[in-house]
Amino acid sequence: MTKNFRIGQIVPSSNTTMETEVPAMLQAHSSLRPEDRFTFHSSRMRMKKVQKEELAAMDAESDRCALELSDARVDVLGYACLVAIMAMGRGYHRVSQKRLTERTAENGASAPVITSAGALVDALHVMGAKKIALVAPYVVPLTELVMDYILSLIHI
């Protein structure tokens, strides 16, 4: 029996990789399980440069993006900007996920939301991580912000 899934993604406007990488992963999954079919839908938050001052302004657009994707009746929604979430402070991934899920419900198309930051923190907990090595495409202050966020939540 065929199962159709609509995958929604909130992505920074300057990101040029996620909209090719995620569909490729979904297609690879479908090749292993042909009964699972996916459509991929994205909405963009405006951001030209990954700088702390732009991250909060960009995150403010995530509510609009969640509404747009809920118009498409997506089954799940991912927020694909780890540093934007982490720049907002300790535990913000939970706040964001809850708020965006509420926006989809208010639009009559409730969809669970996961952020890349939340997925990373959850995965590190599940794995019982004792050490972390981080390679990041950010300037040193933003990389330190990411490390501080992770360390504050997983207690290594």
Report residues per predicted region:
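Hydrophobic, well-structured mid-protein blocks that either form specific transmembrane helices
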Residues: 96-150
